[in-house]
Amino acid sequence: SSIFILSVSTSVYTADSDIYLTQTGTGLTLAIDQVGASNKIGTSQARVILSGTSMTVDLDQLGDTNVLAASISQGNSSSWTYKVTGDSSNATFAVGGTGDVAGSDFDFEATGDSTVLVFNQGDAATSTSGDQDFVVTGASNNINVKCNVIGCKNEWAVSGNSNDIDT
């Protein structure tokens, strides 16, 4: 797993890079920075899939029209950070769709205009707890958050005009 992550890290600093990843196991530490426009980390047809406990995942996309699509099937005691800087990016997260995400923490930060986030947590009957922080700065952003877990906590900081927040 470490060798794969290292090879990804050397190639993510150019525009139009596509990353597809499937990881299962305990203790994953993953950091990806994509700089440039039209980058992808997964797609709606081929999502990144993460499953395990004690994962630390930090994904940053800097530039316009970037895409991220991830399924985090199970992730107890895990921490995810997603930062997007630029306009017209699109991110989709399905968290806890098939397992527990107890003690999980998700931080989302968007700076720019016309960003779309779809975040669904806890569709599995076994999903519990969740702590989400959403920071949105810019105009015309569309944030859709659904949390179906016991003990879900969402915190918001939103600034800018014409932002659409649905929970």
Model regions and ranges:
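Long, low-complexity, polar and repeat-rich extracellular regions
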Residues: 1-167
